[in-house]
Amino acid sequence: AAMMAGHPNDSTPESLRNTAFTLHMGANDSAYNRNKVAAQWEKLLAGLQEKDPQGYTHLVKIHEGKGHWMDREDRVAVPWMAKHTRNPLPQRIVWKQDDVTHNRFYWLAVNNDNRRGRTTTIVQRDGQTFNIERCDLQKIIIRLNDDLCNLNKPITVSYQGNNIFRGKVTRSSELIRQTILERGDYTSVFSAEITVTIPSK
Protein backbone atom coordinates (compact mmCIF):
# COMPACT_ATOMS: atom_id res chain seq x y z
CA ALA A 1 0.00 0.00 0.00
CA ALA A 2 1.20 3.51 -0.75
CA MET A 3 1.58 5.42 2.51
CA MET A 4 1.49 9.06 1.45
CA ALA A 5 -0.17 11.02 4.25
CA GLY A 6 1.42 12.99 7.03
CA HIS A 7 2.88 11.17 10.04
CA PRO A 8 4.49 12.32 13.29
CA ASN A 9 7.61 10.37 12.22
CA ASP A 10 8.07 8.79 15.63
CA SER A 11 7.97 5.15 14.49
CA THR A 12 11.04 2.93 14.50
CA PRO A 13 11.75 -0.22 12.44
CA GLU A 14 12.80 -2.76 15.08
CA SER A 15 9.62 -4.85 14.75
CA LEU A 16 10.27 -5.34 11.02
CA ARG A 17 12.86 -8.02 11.75
CA ASN A 18 10.82 -10.77 10.05
CA THR A 19 9.06 -8.65 7.42
CA ALA A 20 10.46 -8.01 3.96
CA PHE A 21 10.09 -4.23 3.81
CA THR A 22 10.55 -1.82 0.95
CA LEU A 23 10.31 1.95 1.10
CA HIS A 24 10.16 4.21 -1.95
CA MET A 25 10.34 7.99 -1.81
CA GLY A 26 10.66 10.81 -4.27
CA ALA A 27 13.83 12.74 -3.47
CA ASN A 28 11.88 15.99 -3.91
CA ASP A 29 8.95 14.92 -1.73
CA SER A 30 9.68 17.18 1.23
CA ALA A 31 6.20 17.49 2.78
CA TYR A 32 6.25 16.34 6.42
CA ASN A 33 10.01 15.74 5.90
CA ARG A 34 9.14 12.51 4.10
CA ASN A 35 12.31 12.44 2.02
CA LYS A 36 14.56 13.06 5.02
CA VAL A 37 12.81 10.44 7.14
CA ALA A 38 13.03 7.88 4.32
CA ALA A 39 16.79 8.45 4.12
CA GLN A 40 17.01 8.02 7.90
CA TRP A 41 15.10 4.75 7.71
CA GLU A 42 17.49 3.46 5.07
CA LYS A 43 20.32 3.93 7.58
CA LEU A 44 18.30 2.51 10.47
CA LEU A 45 17.37 -0.65 8.56
CA ALA A 46 20.91 -1.13 7.30
CA GLY A 47 22.22 -0.80 10.85
CA LEU A 48 19.74 -3.32 12.20
CA GLN A 49 20.56 -5.82 9.46
CA GLU A 50 24.29 -5.41 10.05
CA LYS A 51 23.77 -6.46 13.68
CA ASP A 52 21.24 -9.17 12.78
CA PRO A 53 22.04 -10.51 9.28
CA GLN A 54 19.22 -13.09 9.38
CA GLY A 55 16.62 -10.34 9.69
CA TYR A 56 15.58 -6.96 8.36
CA THR A 57 15.42 -7.81 4.67
CA HIS A 58 14.78 -4.44 3.07
CA LEU A 59 15.03 -2.26 0.00
CA VAL A 60 14.96 1.52 0.32
CA LYS A 61 14.95 3.52 -2.88
CA ILE A 62 15.06 7.30 -3.02
CA HIS A 63 13.96 8.20 -6.55
CA GLU A 64 16.09 11.14 -7.64
CA GLY A 65 14.34 14.07 -9.27
CA LYS A 66 10.92 12.72 -8.38
CA GLY A 67 8.22 14.20 -6.21
CA HIS A 68 5.21 12.76 -4.46
CA TRP A 69 4.04 10.33 -7.13
CA MET A 70 7.48 9.23 -8.38
CA ASP A 71 6.04 8.81 -11.91
CA ARG A 72 5.25 5.21 -10.94
CA GLU A 73 8.92 4.33 -10.52
CA ASP A 74 7.91 2.74 -7.23
CA ARG A 75 6.34 -0.13 -9.22
CA VAL A 76 9.66 -1.95 -8.83
CA ALA A 77 8.47 -2.71 -5.30
CA VAL A 78 6.01 -5.32 -6.57
CA PRO A 79 8.48 -7.82 -8.13
CA TRP A 80 10.84 -7.29 -5.19
CA MET A 81 8.09 -8.15 -2.70
CA ALA A 82 7.05 -11.16 -4.79
CA LYS A 83 10.43 -12.76 -4.10
CA HIS A 84 9.73 -12.97 -0.38
CA THR A 85 7.41 -15.26 1.58
CA ARG A 86 5.94 -14.46 4.98
CA ASN A 87 7.17 -16.63 7.84
CA PRO A 88 4.45 -16.74 10.52
CA LEU A 89 6.62 -18.74 12.96
CA PRO A 90 10.06 -17.10 13.00
CA GLN A 91 12.93 -18.24 15.19
CA ARG A 92 13.45 -14.78 16.63
CA ILE A 93 11.01 -12.00 17.44
CA VAL A 94 11.74 -8.36 18.13
CA TRP A 95 8.52 -6.69 19.25
CA LYS A 96 8.63 -2.97 19.89
CA GLN A 97 5.25 -1.56 20.82
CA ASP A 98 4.42 1.94 19.60
CA ASP A 99 1.98 4.27 21.34
CA VAL A 100 -0.82 2.33 19.61
CA THR A 101 -0.48 -1.08 21.25
CA HIS A 102 -1.43 -4.60 20.20
CA ASN A 103 -2.02 -7.77 22.18
CA ARG A 104 -0.20 -10.26 19.93
CA PHE A 105 2.76 -10.45 17.58
CA TYR A 106 3.66 -13.73 15.87
CA TRP A 107 3.79 -16.28 18.73
CA LEU A 108 3.98 -13.69 21.50
CA ALA A 109 1.01 -12.13 23.27
CA VAL A 110 0.13 -9.92 26.22
CA ASN A 111 -3.01 -9.54 28.29
CA ASN A 112 -4.76 -6.22 27.92
CA ASP A 113 -4.05 -5.28 31.54
CA ASN A 114 -0.33 -5.80 30.94
CA ARG A 115 -0.14 -4.03 27.59
CA ARG A 116 2.02 -0.89 27.48
CA GLY A 117 3.34 1.34 24.75
CA ARG A 118 7.01 2.05 24.07
CA THR A 119 8.10 -1.38 25.31
CA THR A 120 10.40 -3.93 23.71
CA THR A 121 10.35 -7.72 23.90
CA ILE A 122 13.00 -9.90 22.25
CA VAL A 123 12.71 -13.70 22.26
CA GLN A 124 14.86 -16.31 20.53
CA ARG A 125 13.60 -19.86 19.93
CA ASP A 126 15.85 -22.89 19.59
CA GLY A 127 13.79 -26.05 19.24
CA GLN A 128 11.91 -26.56 22.52
CA THR A 129 13.68 -23.68 24.25
CA PHE A 130 12.69 -20.02 24.30
CA ASN A 131 15.14 -17.45 25.64
CA ILE A 132 13.69 -14.07 26.54
CA GLU A 133 16.56 -11.67 25.96
CA ARG A 134 14.59 -8.57 26.85
CA CYS A 135 11.08 -7.88 28.11
CA ASP A 136 9.97 -4.50 29.43
CA LEU A 137 6.68 -5.98 30.67
CA GLN A 138 5.87 -7.80 33.89
CA LYS A 139 4.42 -10.78 32.04
CA ILE A 140 4.63 -12.18 28.52
CA ILE A 141 2.70 -15.02 26.89
CA ILE A 142 4.43 -17.49 24.58
CA ARG A 143 1.98 -19.21 22.29
CA LEU A 144 2.67 -22.66 20.88
CA ASN A 145 1.46 -25.07 18.25
CA ASP A 146 2.70 -28.34 16.78
CA ASP A 147 4.39 -26.58 13.88
CA LEU A 148 6.47 -24.50 16.27
CA CYS A 149 7.43 -27.20 18.79
CA ASN A 150 6.78 -30.80 19.77
CA LEU A 151 4.03 -30.24 22.30
CA ASN A 152 4.35 -33.81 23.55
CA LYS A 153 7.74 -32.92 25.02
CA PRO A 154 8.71 -30.39 27.71
CA ILE A 155 9.16 -26.72 26.84
CA THR A 156 11.84 -24.58 28.46
CA VAL A 157 11.64 -20.82 28.87
CA SER A 158 14.58 -18.81 30.12
CA TYR A 159 15.08 -15.14 30.87
CA GLN A 160 18.51 -13.86 29.95
CA GLY A 161 19.86 -17.41 30.21
CA ASN A 162 18.19 -18.36 33.51
CA ASN A 163 15.40 -20.94 33.39
CA ILE A 164 12.01 -19.62 34.55
CA PHE A 165 9.79 -22.43 33.20
CA ARG A 166 10.19 -26.05 32.23
CA GLY A 167 7.37 -28.48 31.67
CA LYS A 168 4.78 -29.90 29.35
CA VAL A 169 1.87 -27.82 28.11
CA THR A 170 -1.76 -28.75 27.58
CA ARG A 171 -3.50 -28.19 24.28
CA SER A 172 -6.65 -26.08 24.56
CA SER A 173 -9.57 -26.07 22.13
CA GLU A 174 -10.61 -22.70 23.56
CA LEU A 175 -7.23 -21.17 22.66
CA ILE A 176 -7.52 -22.60 19.15
CA ARG A 177 -10.91 -20.93 18.83
CA GLN A 178 -9.63 -17.65 20.28
CA THR A 179 -6.64 -17.39 17.96
CA ILE A 180 -8.77 -18.23 14.93
CA LEU A 181 -11.12 -15.38 15.85
CA GLU A 182 -8.23 -12.99 16.44
CA ARG A 183 -6.83 -13.19 12.94
CA GLY A 184 -8.63 -15.76 10.83
CA ASP A 185 -5.19 -16.96 9.71
CA TYR A 186 -4.70 -20.71 9.81
CA THR A 187 -0.91 -20.29 10.02
CA SER A 188 -1.29 -18.30 13.26
CA VAL A 189 -3.56 -20.65 15.18
CA PHE A 190 -2.14 -21.75 18.53
CA SER A 191 -3.22 -24.60 20.78
CA ALA A 192 -1.18 -23.96 23.94
CA GLU A 193 0.45 -21.07 25.72
CA ILE A 194 2.77 -20.30 28.60
CA THR A 195 2.45 -17.13 30.67
CA VAL A 196 5.72 -16.22 32.35
CA THR A 197 6.48 -13.53 34.90
CA ILE A 198 9.64 -11.58 34.17
CA PRO A 199 11.99 -11.55 37.18
CA SER A 200 12.40 -8.11 38.70
CA LYS A 201 15.81 -6.54 38.34
Specify the residue positions occupied by each region the protein language model found.
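The feature captures the conserved acid-bearing segment of alpha/beta-hydrolase catalytic domains
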Residues: 2-81
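Alpha/beta-hydrolase-fold serine-hydrolase catalytic core, especially in secreted/extracellular enzymes
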Residues: 46-201
